[in-house]
Amino acid sequence: MNSMSKKEYKHFERSITLHIKHADFELVGQKYRGRDLYEYLFIKGSKPIHTATGKTSNLYEIISEDKGPDEALKIIGDTFTEDDINILLRGGFHDDNKTPEGVLELIQHILLAGEVLHPGGDVIEPQSFKDYPEKIQAYADQLINDDSIDILESITRVIGEAHYGDEKAVKLLLLSIGTLFLRDTPPVHQALRGSTGSGKTDLVLKTVLAVPERYVHILRSASPKYLFYASETGILREDYNIFVFDDIELNDEIIAISKTITDNILPEKEHHTVKDQEALKLEIPGEGLAIFTRARDIHDNELNDRLLYNNPVEDEDHSRFVKEKIKEEAISGSVMDDKRIMEAYEVIRAVYERLIEGDVRVYNPYLHLLDLRGYSNRDIKHIVGLVKAVTWYRQHKRRREGSYVREGGHDIIIGTEDDLRDALELWMSIDTLQRYKLDRKQEKFLKSLPEYSDELYKQHTNSIFWDDPELPTYSGLAERLGLSKSTIYRWVNGRHEKDRDIEGLKDKGNKGLVIIKPLEPENPKSPSLIYRKPGIVGKHLQLKNGGEASESGFTLFPSVDMDLGTAENARIWKKTIFHSMVLGVSQIQSNIQDNLIQEWLDNNTNPMETHEDVVEFIVDVRAFIHDNLQTPPDVTCNPVYTILGNGKHPLETGGESSNHGDKHDLVLTRAGSIVGNRVNSENKGSEPSDEMTCFPQKNYYSGVGGDLQAEYTDAMARGDDSMIGELEARIPPDTPENLEERRVTLKKKLKDKSISAGEKMELLKELGGVLSTLMRKPVDNERIVEYAKELGEVRREIEDMQGG
């Protein structure tokens, strides 16, 4: 029974050598490229039972060489260990003979009498664009290079051949997938809600089928065994992973793992648990996107808050449409149709390879014009992420701007107003679902309620009959909408389930979404009247466009198609774009005199009337920065170098974390820090650093020199090199001991109840930098986990102080 340890074959690429099915049982074999090693996945009723790894026997030879029953049984017995067989026995991988021998005989029977679903051989799963057949590559490049073709629409149409309807839900899911591959954009995790039979699972599976298979992991069991196995054996990738939780029970362990995956702050994602008195650690590498299909509510508030709610269409017309399409397919469908669809999917997967290899950052200047007051910080990030994802899909049709600092830095894609509006149109299709965490049926019920007014309530209280079906009572609504009274009552009032209180519509939002009034004000036992709270649906945002409301419901101010309204509005927009290009305004102003910036903006005559004008202005801004910036010697740690040279938002300038680069990029500091720009005594000239952390060995946010910041800023502004040198000499080295001392000092200061909110914010931001730097030091893993958790708490506290 030859086998190899999991660590020895980690990260090998696999090829399918066998897929065979008998009755309810399936056996899938895979070979590791370059090694005579195999793994075998056992499936019962579409659910994985066990994966036997590191085997040296190719069971496909039993079929290809027409082995006899006795010889086949011997090969099987030599291939699998006693532990393998016992796991299969406990998992139900047996027929009537519930013994180890019975398991071996079942495997023998599957191999000798089963239906071969895969012909065997050595078909390698593509690992990059060049691994696809030349014909598929040509089709993919044709799609990408044809200016008349919208890639997002093309992918949606292909999926529509396999999943009928739900175009907007499919596009929203595609946009979430796009955020995974975007630099400097947190992934937008999704929950596909919908009642049983609504098609949510089919929608998700047919959508992720368009993504290269190596990135996708589908979980159908509440046991996390697959994830632990996938982590140990290298199935989880170091770059990107998509996790589909397909309507599985969200037990405590799955919720904990889900929260680890969806935490966009943690630099290293680990989940610790104990099983059979053994401590286990699940390491989740790379960037991760979580997708949940759920018929029921997600009861963990923290996890629920991180997810974007999506929902298939649920109405009679859509149901009839889908059934009619299925009937037509059954009548006229053919093997050729399936082959055509699968080939189209393969082309789309090749297109994804092209999109992913671009490694781009998207900048959409029109995002500055959005008025998102009333939205949570989380939803604002979701909206921005979706807008950028639209541009990501259209990257080959959008303007690319290269770097003035680094050769070949063509990775900044400028988004358009169309990209923005297309994303907002999709957002508005789930706006109510997302803002209030509803499903489609609850949303439909909410919209069917009359909006409350004193006049309407007075009119209803004058009704003679309690059972009038036109009254918005539980009985009247149930009769009119075809729902049960108990369902409506549960939706409105919530319920208690599994030691959890599930809030109802009367409690959702700040003060509830519905208003409940007695039919007879003086009689508390009279039927309740249920109204929709005013302003809940469709009126929370307006587009300021000549005073007329837009159907999109979003505010664009000033509107680009109004020629920006006034010269003053155009000037404000220019200034905003300028600052976003340099990110850290204080860094620039310490190197470019403030009056130069203002003079340049005042003299810029760009009318900003067309997208070409906007692009030209962005190009001019970048040229101005390049021409006027006095680049310090330690260029690689200058935030301006980082944004222009690498297209990354450095965290010390307040940008989003880029978890696609070095794992230590996750740092938390404030915009305006300039101390780190010129204090790296260990950097050699302007040689690029492999670790683009923008945290030199000695700086303000590394901690121990923090109290010198005001003096240092003043010296930098005066250009007093003598004072700068003196102050730099006083900054102690960033040793773990000094950093830990500073961490303790900062935490003590934060406990002082007398400090102002502004002082607290500064201390929190400095603490974030200290923790980030500590995580890059040679400290033990327990310390790193402690620092990472504390960093997450600091980040969340800062977000709370900034308004949610």
From Swiss-Prot:
Return the protein name: Uncharacterized protein MTBMA_p00010
**Keywords recorded for this protein, A-Z:** Plasmid
SUPFAM superfamilies, A to Z = P-loop containing nucleoside triphosphate hydrolases
Q: What is the lineage of its organism?
A: Archaea, Methanobacteriati, Methanobacteriota, Methanomada group, Methanobacteria
Record organism: Methanothermobacter marburgensis (strain ATCC BAA-927 / DSM 2133 / JCM 14651 / NBRC 100331 / OCM 82 / Marburg) (Methanobacterium thermoautotrophicum)
Which InterPro entries would you find in this protein's record? Cro/C1-type_HTH (IPR001387), P-loop_NTPase (IPR027417)
